[in-house]
Regions:
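Helix-loop boundary and gating motifs at the non-cytosolic
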Residues: 1-44, 201-202, 211-224, 228
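Helix-breaking motifs and short loop linkers at transmembrane-helix boundaries and internal kinks
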Residues: 62, 83-85, 282-284
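Residue-level signature of mid-helix packing/kink "hotspots" within the transmembrane helices
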Residues: 44-52, 136-137, 243-247, 251, ...
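Juxtamembrane intracellular "pre-TM" segments in multi-pass secondary transporters
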Residues: 175-204
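Structural signature of the two symmetry-related core transmembrane helices
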Residues: 65-79, 160, 264-278
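C-terminal membrane-cytosol helix-exit motif in multi-pass small-molecule transporters
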Residues: 160-181, 368-372
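Cytoplasmic helix-loop-helix junction between adjacent transmembrane helices
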Residues: 95-131
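Helix-to-loop junctions at the C-terminal end of transmembrane segments
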Residues: 50-62, 147, 249-261
Length: 372
């Protein structure tokens, strides 16, 4: 399990770090906030199409080759911007990185959920989510330092190197070709059947909106901080503090789940996060910004692991990978639509309304969660 988490940390750090260097490099090239929003949406364009297919592929073939292929495609995406220049290269990087991470992420979550019984599954997802938090710290901080000291091409090269240990390790080990239960090879099953199940449908929608809020913070914080003339290193530190708070929350999550249902914990965390989003753009002081980023990390830190665990528990037998792919497809619908809307909003009114829109979004879905 710990080797799985180590590979996940490396690939997730590459994914998150690329979003920061792509947005900052685009700003340096003179891109508008609308263009930044389209770039953010490009990360979700291929996953939007491939999400359900990737889940079916994992259910039918196992997890090993989708893990290898996903990491390799991400490496190729980074190398495009090492050797290419301009917005065209950045769009290609965003497209390939999003596609590769989709296959890797569906596989790693299916593999994690398939290890052990239901009680062990909760522990495994908690460990995986801690890994995600660690990579959320490593990615932004390392890429901020790399941009300031090595330039944008150097940062992309560093991120490409993050993907190499998982690729090499998985190529030489067959331990990770795992699926929970019998391989599901029924070609006639319909994904619409899953959406007709209210427990699955609700967690899919909620997951998409939670991830969109988290991703928008990672993508629009650099835009907002850039207007305040913060360096890439400082921006990385702010995102690192946000990630560190998520690590704390995820260590505490098993204790919280012993006393309250997952849905109640998620309700409290989402409402807590909404308050942080509402006040974030009111501060231009770095120390206040660090404090609010920590506050936000405490709230959002539980959202994604809880949605992963709840979705897996609600999956029909033999279709866990497909439900994971469906959930990630919903995540990417939100990642396409919301960044483009927010990009246009930011171009017209500035970055602050983007944060306030997130606050409204999280408040609304927190009460949807409360009703379940």
């Amino acid at each position: 399990m710990y080797l799985i988490v180590a590979y996940s940390i490396a690939v997730h750090a590459c994914y998150l770090g690329s979003k920061i260097v792509v947005s900052l490099y685009a700003l340096q090239l003179g891109a508008s906030q609308t263009a930044i929003g389209v770039l953010a949406a490009m990360y979700a364009a291929a996953p939007l199409i491939l999400g359900i297919y990737s889940g079916r592929l994992v259910d039918s073939t196992g997890t090993r080759w989708p893990l290898i292929g996903g990491a390799a495609v991400m490496c190729a995406g980074m190398l495009i911007s090492v050797f290419g220049h301009g917005l065209t290269a950045l769009f290609a990087t965003a497209l390939l990185t999003g596609a590769g991470f989709m296959f890797f992420n569906v596989s790693i979550q299916t593999l994690t959920g398939g290890l052990g019984d239901k009680e062990q599954r909760a522990r495994n997802f908690a460990i995986l989510s801690i890994g995600y938090s660690i990579s959320t710290f490593i990615g932004p901080v390392s890429v901020g330092l790399a941009i300031d000291h090595l330039g944008h091409a150097g940062a992309f090269l560093m991120l490409a190197m993050f993907t190499l240990p998982p690729i090499v390790g998985l190529l030489f080990s067959r331990r990770f070709n795992f699926i929970n239960g019998e391989k599901n090879t029924d070609k006639n099953r319909s994904t619409l059947e899953l959406l007709r199940l209210p427990p699955v449908r609700s967690v899919v929608i909620i997951s998409g909106l939670i991830v969109a809020a988290s991703d928008l913070f990672a993508f629009y914080l650099p835009v907002y901080a850039h207007t305040l003339n913060f360096s890439a290193t400082v921006i990385g530190v702010v995102l690192g503090v946000y990630a560190f708070a998520g690590i704390i929350t995820r260590f505490a999550m098993p204790l919280l789940l012993k006393h309250w249902r997952g849905e109640r914990v998620m309700f409290a965390c989402l409402l807590f996060s909404a308050c942080a989003f509402a006040v974030f753009p009111l501060s231009t002081n770095l120390y206040y910004m660090l404090a609010i980023a920590f506050w936000l990390g405490l709230g959002l830190g539980c959202g994604q692991p809880l949605s992963m665990m709840i979705a897996y528990n609600r999956s029909p037998e033999g279709r866990a990978g497909e439900v994971t792919g469906l959930r990630l497809t919903a995540n990417n619908v939100a990642r396409v639509v919301i960044p483009m809307v927010c990009g246009a909003l930011g171009a017209a009114l500035g970055a602050a309304p983007v944060f306030w829109l997130n606050a409204i979004n999280l408040t609304a879905i927190s009460f949807v969660v409360w009703r379940q």
